[in-house]
Structures are given as structure tokens and as C-alpha cells.
Amino acid sequence: MDLRPELPTVSSASQVHPGAAAAAAAASIPVSMAGNLLRGPPLLLRAADKYPRTPKCARCRNHGVVSALKGHKRYCRWKDCMCAKCTLIAERQRVMAAQVALRRQQAQEENEARELQLLYGTAEGLALAAANGIIPPRPNYEVFGSVNSESNSESSIQKYELFPKTQLSGSTTTQKSVGKPASTESDSAPGMSSPDGRHGGGSGSENGDSESFINSPVSKPLKDGEETPGSVSSLGSDSGSETDKEEQEPSPSSAASRHMNAIDILTRVFPSHKRSVLELVLQGCGKDVVQAIEQILNNSGAQAPNKAGPEETWTAERMLQSAQQPPAGSATAATTTRPMLPGAMTLSNRSAFSPLQPNAPHFGADPGTYPLGTHLGLNPLRLAYSAHSRGLAFMTPYSTTGLMPTLGFRPPMDYAFSDLIRDRTMLHKEQGYASGLYGPLVNNTPDKQ
């Protein structure tokens, strides 16, 4: 619509008569434009409507009936209709319900995550994640550094020291006494062990293995200047071979040096034992230093160092016999294979499945020996189990009827050989239980003197 030709006429008419000019302008505007100017916005018209729009039933609308939805769903006449339009409406309702349920679940999960974050905070969450292994720990939490690191203090190394300083110095002297080929091989050891040291410093906090644990005491003598790199090469190659034992087998030279170190440790821990005996025990234990030390302590703990020659050889044979036995899978099976040494088993560490020594009051002798007379003609195997020990609680099916397993028993020799030995042994009269089979504690009768 173009109003340009009409503008001059309007201006001229306004100059002639103002009322006529206004009438001419109103007559020149089209009717559609006048209607748009006089009509209000649609929101105002809907708000001004007398009857607002209410939701209607879709099934009824499909069938040409208009009905309000409020209170109508249960009583709709087409609620079970299976026509195409009603089926489409049912599918739409199902999809909308699934979407609403999914949104509710997502909102609930977000709220739970927000609550956990507010509850634990950022620092605690990182600490828990690092403890669970999700996030690698930070470098300032590292306890053990590499072999060549100078940052670790003397106190932190002393706290986690595996071998004493004297043992390390002693082992280095023996390494020096072996010969010069060890030093020539160790000249190239720092170059080869430097990546291992860097690897141990980087992965010690991630893997938490014991290789960096072993490396930390080695770095202390290296910093003090007491030893050369050749003397440390034995322990360095030892820890390096343990680090890479999953990938490749250790070399024979490293195995020999490990064996020599084990022998040196055993000789310094047990200076009273012969080196050949210690080598046999270590070989029987599969070159395990800890197991060999346990065997020697269990077998020779209660014996004096100044024993006679035959007694010492007998102890060595017993130690070798116990060391050559195969390692058992469980603790109870391991206790069955331990040999019985005189005086080695006291009341505090007796096992239920190992033979016990006879009681001193019953046989009138020192508990560290077997004081059976030669006139009895009995070997020590007849003395199966003691009378008052907790080991009999497990052996009652084999010794007695087992009615009261935890109380005192008569000794086996007291009733097994009552007609033959009771008058000839050195049994005390007050120790014999004449009131019954199980003694005064079970029969509730005073002991007859």
C-alpha cells in the first residue's frame, strides 16, 4: 500500500479545514489495517475469554465426543478401545511415562552425587580415590626414593632400614674378598642400574613393592662413602633381578651372589653354627633366608652353645632333616613336620600335633633330657603325649575315650603298662591317680595319698 500520493492532499486539506482532513485520512486507510490496530494481543483475548480451555479426553475426541478429562478417565466409554487412533494415544502415553521416569532417575542420581560431594569434600574425595588406587598418589607422599636420590633424610631411611649397617659392611668385605671379577662386572653396573633406579623411584609409589624398600638402605652407605659401587653391586643386582623377575629370569651370577649373601647373613646371625651346616639348611629350605632362620631358631633355641661333639652333630642332622622336608601348605601341616628336640618345646609353644616330652614330676628328671633307665627297655617313642597339656585335647580319640578332653589325664604309661612298669619306674606315689581313670578333677573325689 502506497500512501505517498495521498500525503500532499492531506496536508493541503489540513490547511483548508482540519475536520475534513481527518475524515479524508480515515477514509484513505484500508479496513484490514484498521482492524489490526483495534484488535488486542491474543493472550489478552484468551484471558478475557469467559470460559477458559480445559483438558479434554483424547479417546472421546477421536470418536466425536467432547468431554472434560477431570474425573473422566475411569468412566470413559472408549477406555478399552483398540482402534488405530486409540492405540496411537496409548503408545504416546507409554513413551511419555518412560521419559518422565528416566528424568526422575537422572535427577535423583545427580542429587545423590551432589550430596556426596558436599559431604566428603574435595580433599577427602581425592584421598579416598588415591587409597583405592583410582588416582596415582602425589610425589610428596613418596616414602622411598631411588638409589641415587639425595633428597631423602637420614631419619626416614633409618626408620625403614631392612638390614643393619654392620651386616651391610660385613657383606661388602666378603664381596671384596671373593675376587676382582666382581668389581670388573660392577663397573658397568651403575650404568645399567641407573634406569632401574629411576624406574624404582617413579614406580615405587605406584606399585608399593619391596624393591625400593630394599634400595633405601643401600643408598645410605653409598652416600657415606664407606663402600664402592662394586661392593653395592651385589645388593643392587639382587633388587634389580627381583624387580624384573616377572619379565625375565635372573642371571646365574646374580643367583650366586644372592646365595652368597644369604650364607653371609646366616653366618652372622648364627656365629656358633658351622658354615657347612648353615649351607645345608639353606639348601634344604630352597635358599629362603627367612625360612632357614626360622628352622634354626625352632630347632636350636633352647640348646646351650657349649654342647658336646655328638650332641652338636645330632642337632645338625635334625636341622638338616627338618630343612629338607617339603614346605607344607598350611600351618598345622608345617607343625607336624617339625622334629622334636629335647628342651625345645615348652608349655607356651607346644603344638597339638607334635610329640611332647615327659613331665618332670612323673619321671623325676630334668625336662630337658629323656631320663628313661636302660633297665626299662623302652625307646622314647613310647612316651607319646604328656598328661597335662592342651595338646591332648586334639589327641583324645587316639589316647582315651575322650569324654572330658580338656581336663587332666592319667599319663599313658600309668595305665598302659601298669602291671609291668609301675613298680620299677621312678614314679612318685602322690602322682598316681587311684580314684579312677581320669583322675581327681574328673571324678570329683579327693586324691588318695
UniProtKB/Swiss-Prot annotation:
Primary localisation category: nucleus
Tissue: Expressed in brain and eye.
Keyword field contains Nucleotidyltransferase: no
Record field: compositional bias (Low complexity): 230-240
DNA-binding region residue numbers: 57-104
Pfam families the record matches: DM, DMA, DMRT5_DMB
CC terms in the record's Gene Ontology section: nucleus
Classification via SUPFAM superfamilies: Cysteine-rich DNA binding domain, (DM domain), UBA-like
GO aspect biological process, one term: germ cell development
Chain intervals with Polar residues compositional bias: 166-187
Annotated ranges, domain DMA: 260-295
Cellular location(s): Nucleus
SMART domains cross-referenced by the UniProt entry: DM
A molecular-function term among this protein's GO annotations: DNA-binding transcription factor activity, RNA polymerase II-specific
Iron found in the keyword field: no
UniProt similarity note: Belongs to the DMRT family.
Function: May be involved in sexual development.
PANTHER family reported in the protein's UniProt record: DOUBLESEX AND MAB-3 RELATED TRANSCRIPTION FACTOR DMRT (PTHR12322), DOUBLESEX- AND MAB-3-RELATED TRANSCRIPTION FACTOR A2 (PTHR12322:SF76)
Protein name: Doublesex- and mab-3-related transcription factor A2
